[in-house]
Amino acid sequence: MAQVSINSDYSEWGSSTDAGERARLLQSPCVDVVPKREGEASPGDPDSGTTSTLGAVFIVVNACLGAGLLNFPAAFSTAGGVAAGIALQMGMLVFIISGLVILAYCSQASNERTYQEVVWAVCGKLTGVLCEIAIAVYTFGTCIAFLIIIGDQQDKIIAVMAKEPDGASGSPWYTDRKFTISLTAFLFILPLSIPKEIGFQKYASSLSVVGTWYVTAIVIIKYIWPDKEMRPGDILTRPASWMAVFNAMPTICFGFQCHVSSVPVFNSMRQPQVKTWGGVVTAAMVIALAVYMGTGICGFLTFGAAVDPDVLRSYPSEDVAVAVARAFIILSVLTSYPILHFCGRAVVEGLWLRYKGTPVEEDVGRERRRRVLQTLVWFLLTLLLALFIPDIGKVISVIGGLAACFIFIFPGLCLIQAKLSEMEEVKPASWWALVSYGVLLVTLGAFIFGQTTANAVFVDLLA
């Protein structure tokens, strides 16, 4: 077996325990990962975790499914219909699963337990910094999307409570979207975002799962038994151009991006073996694919090209079953925002402390003041942007490109570097095949990131 010599300059900027909580960064809300100490079991040790194989499947599905679900019917419309949407997702699934397996392999090789630590250890300091910056921007953008989703659902719920028809004008000031989003954010999200720890993670995850499955069920049921007043728009059967297909990529990448939280899940397993993990992620992605396809196909066929970027906005306000779905989504987002903010704040904190060369063991008062300041700046910026961005589609079009980096580029770079580090005089055909596949991942990821980001900037944001 080839020996592997992974880059070791990760330690130049500090160990994985700096920035207060780096070892817990971006782990799945259902997984408790204990920072490594000398003498602890490595990721390959059978006694290194407590999560069963079935439990790991559930956690990965939980990490994958989320708010991006609401945008999938619009993604099918953008891609050019059901056939194009299905083909795009099926083609992407191979790369999504392989990226998850690559990360597990590199986690074993580097003995690291979180996504960014694996990238640091395998690819070096520069790539590690870029990875952490990407995580910070991605979580920031996702928080903006969460606030927009809250506004979308509140608009419909308030319309029912005020007994106003959809699209009515001249509403009272206290029903204005900007006011309701701001009030909800200050009353609920900000207090939950300031604490150093977020002990409600597991409850929030369970709520998110219930809400996601309920939304999927409602969309499918409403397609099978539609309301009489609902009339679909044009049902596209083919994409307008090949570029239109790629415009659906951000939603798919955003929806299936669970790679950042996958490494802690892998290391939490009782038997964290790459072969077992391959079965786990394959089963999890098939389940997620079924949920996303069910929502995307049925939502698109119900409304056609007229579907809203947030599919729940396309349904009448007075529909009780859909109103329950909206309430589920609001509760889920209210608890998910602090979790994403916690992850982004930890990245920013780590980068800042390493840049300043400040030890973690500083006085508690300075840490508390800095945490409150970081939280307020993060919260106010995301709120301000959410108030003036009209729909989640525009946000997902931007952060979906970053999701492609986590799915394609960083796993591809890790695979290339891991294989290049092997001490073998004669390289077998499998070695060249894996290196070539790594190059393919990086190239494809760079193309998706560049194309979707450019399209988001010049078409969506500047339109």
From Swiss-Prot:
Gene3D superfamilies: Amino acid/polyamine transporter I. Its main location: membrane. One of its GO terms (cellular component) is lysosomal membrane. It is found in: Lysosome membrane; Cell projection, Axon. Keywords: Amino-acid transport, Cell projection, Ion transport, Lysosome, Membrane, Phosphoprotein, Sodium, Sodium transport, Transmembrane, Transmembrane helix, Transport. Pfam families: Aa_trans. GO terms for biological process: amino acid transmembrane transport; asparagine transport; glutamine transport; sodium ion transport. GO terms for molecular function: active monoatomic ion transmembrane transporter activity; L-asparagine transmembrane transporter activity; L-asparagine:sodium symporter activity; L-glutamine transmembrane transporter activity; L-glutamine:sodium symporter activity. It is a multi-pass membrane protein. The chain crosses the membrane at residues 56-76, 82-102, 130-150, 179-199, 206-226, 240-260, 283-303, 320-340, 372-392, 396-416, 429-449. The keyword Ion transport applies. The modification Phosphoserine is found at residue 28. The keyword Ion transport applies. InterPro entries: AA_transpt_TM. It catalyses: L-asparagine(in) + Na(+)(in) = L-asparagine(out) + Na(+)(out); L-glutamine(in) + Na(+)(in) = L-glutamine(out) + Na(+)(out). It comes from the Eukaryota. Interacts with the mTORC1 complex; this interaction mediates the recruitment of mTORC1 to the lysosome and its subsequent activation. Belongs to the amino acid/polyamine transporter 2 family. Symporter that selectively cotransports sodium ions and amino acids, such as L-glutamine and L-asparagine from the lysosome into the cytoplasm and may participates in mTORC1 activation. The transport activity requires an acidic lysosomal lumen. This is Sodium-coupled neutral amino acid transporter 7. It comes from Rattus norvegicus (Rat).
